[in-house]
């Protein structure tokens, strides 16, 4: 090949912009510029995942396959990825538990259920509402058909020996033969029964936090001089660029970790139920599910089995050892444990981790109507948007505390300026 031919081929592949395109993708996905020329082996695990995602996006591929691409991404990066994929001109196949992400990116939804694969036009929310409507219609049609069947059978039973009614009886027998009561195919999609019921209504004093500060062992400031009061009815989402900040805060207010400075106090009427990020210690045991759950609430074996049944553990499954459960099964056990507390304040550290979409939907729906207080962190945009009525962001220089919806928070220019200031961005 001649040099001119190589240059032509290089230009066709957009080679002159290769380095700047790569830098744009890396920066968009949250890899800082000073890490762009660092060896992969020197990056953290989360940074490596972002580089791999940038590699998949690079080169404008004809077909892009993404498996849970939003895992461990912060809100700015997820928003950037949503916008990038929404404007992507080629085919994208994506698997995700992030409903807002699916709604923002997808034009079609592939449903794998009833042993079949079906494609629907529309995003996730449109598919979900349509599928629920179709199911309700099927159930109504079946109920009407069963009622009609009972009416016909009752008429035939009463008048089969009545000569004067013989023609009517014969007519109804024919109608009964033609009546088809279609069985509704059982779905592989199961929704757990998640219901949090506070045993006691909370008073006006929920939680008071004064001057709370915490650093890591390496000296990294997670949050500093945090002051706020939680009011009755508050459902607070905690945000931070450093996920360890939220976890440390929750561990402190649950008495599992000491702050470097400051105090906190719970109201006398408050009972809490805590869902920690790391539940490993809860499952380092040989207990089966029934015995494990019995540690956390009152009730006999039959009651506990029924409770586990609502959380989608049935039959012999309830006798499995908890140590062999999957991540999603362990999360459902932890949620069951919380429900037994009948607490009026829930503390949830990234509660949708390991859960499937059905469990997330059930969890989300109950928290929207929950009558107590909620303090939580989450990567799930839809979960935050529909549950939280207050936002507190923990930064190294204090907090941002706003009574507003999440969508407004992440799009507000004022908040963007405030966040940059609080994090010391240049």
Feature map (PLM): residue ranges:
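Proline-centered turn/helix-capping motifs that create local helix->coil transitions or kinks
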Residues: 164-168, 178-188, 265
